Amino acid sequence: EIVLSRVVIPQTIVVHDGVPTDSTAKNYYVPYRDYIKNVACSEIYSTWPESSITANVLAIMSFTLNRVYTEWYRNQGYDFTITSSTAFDHKWIPERNIYDSISIIVDELFADYLARPNVRQPILTQYCDGRQVQCPNWMTIL
């Protein structure tokens, strides 16, 4: 098993445009920052309040960096970093439009991620809308 010795913000990530087992899906080499902007524009609304966009961008970056840090797909024998399939990862769309409200926040948070105290590894964060995706204790006060 390969796990990086430290958290690295990659210059580029390899996005497999399909499910992991689809050998016909194209691999795209995408600058990390552009990938995060694309995913955020594909997963959330640009009209949301700034705090909501910020929270979601942090979740996207943490999930992505967890895939990078743990070498998740490479440890399974694949030659990519992450997929575009929401069954496994985030929605990513080649050449999609990027909204300014999201782009600015990604630029501000570029190297940030969520982690537990005294744990270096970025958290594999979940998305929950309460309808299509259910998460334990979502929208509850603990």
Predicted ranges, named:
Residues 1-142:
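Conserved, single-site charged/polar hotspot
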